[in-house]
Regions:
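Short beta-strand "wing" residues that participate in macromolecule-binding interfaces
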Residues: 95
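Short linear capping/connector segments at secondary-structure termini
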Residues: 16-20, 52-56, 69, 119-125
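C-terminal peripheral helix-coil segments that are non-catalytic and often amphipathic
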Residues: 33, 37, 74, 78, ...
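Hydrophobic alpha-helical connector segments
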Residues: 9, 15-51, 98-105
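Residues that scaffold the ATP/ADP-binding catalytic core of kinase and kinase-like folds
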Residues: 4, 13, 117-118
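Amphipathic alpha-helical packing segments from all-alpha helical-bundle domains
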Residues: 29, 40-49, 53-55, 63-89, ...
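Alpha-helical DNA-contacting segments of helix-turn-helix folds
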Residues: 1-9
């Protein structure tokens, strides 16, 4: 049951049916949608509360932490790495190490936004235009490094 709850929560981030990314979308579209969904999701009050509980309980119940990672963040990283590999094979990107590229992109999205929400009482996450601007900048940064070879 716990595994299914976490899997469904991670599906909200990818935004696709059953949590799958649009494997035929352009990198800019897929990364932009994923980035915005992720940033919105991880800065929500309920997501921050859930994350706090997971960090606290994973020490006491390691299996809970493993399930959380596998069905949550690990699933999102894996789905993105799979997409990046496909886009590279189509010539839309140049990602020799899709797993690393996925972690770097999602790290740029998360930045310090989740940490602020976790430890700063009353933190008000940025919304709207500022959130979109953050995601667009992360996408531009990613494409500058991993865009197709010229």
């Amino acid at each position: 049951l716990f595994s299914e709850i976490v899997r469904r929560r991670s599906a909200r981030i990818t935004g696709g049916q059953d949590g799958e990314l649009d494997m035929n979308g352009t990198p800019r579209e897929v990364l932009g949608k994923l980035g915005l969904n992720m940033l919105r999701f991880i800065t929500r009050a309920d997501s921050l509360s859930f994350h706090r509980v997971m960090v606290a309980e994973a020490v006491r119940v390691p299996e809970l932490g493993r399930i959380f990672y596998a069905q949550g963040p690990g699933r999102v990283y894996g789905g993105l790495a799979n997409y990046l590999g496909c886009a590279t094979r189509r010539g839309e990107l140049s990602c020799p190490k899709p797993e690393l590229a996925a972690k770097l992109f999602l790290g740029a999205i998360v930045a310090n936004n989740q940490l602020l929400g976790l430890v700063a009482p009353g933190f008000e996450p940025f919304k709207g235009k500022k959130m979109r601007a953050h995601v667009e900048e992360a996408v531009e940064l990613f494409l500058a490094r991993y865009g197709p070879s010229q």
